[in-house]
């Protein structure tokens, strides 16, 4: 993971059970959407390897779970839009939700986290935000 890539995370006080989040997913998806997601996953890895982080805006465009699970998270699209407007390459749902994560350069990570949290706050939803970076050392003895 490139050292310049950071993560703005917002955890809204919205309960999304993994079991329910799985239940909203379709049993089948169109072949075209599946192929598109595979190409985006490949672009995601390539973007990290080549440090071409601007490609993450396309690579993070998911058709397999985000369109369905975002309906479980109030104002999800507004949070994604706020993240991008504040400088994020893109944003997505972390796991089954309700945590949202934006991929952003170090210089903009706090602005993006603040913008994401502000959407929930403005709509009366308590939340916590975090500015994170990847641990590239892996497992180690402390």
Please place each PLM-identified region on the residue numbering.
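Glycine-rich, charge-dense phosphate/pyrophosphate-binding loop(s)
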Residues: 48-142
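Active-site rim beta-loop-alpha module in soluble metabolic enzymes
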Residues: 8-71
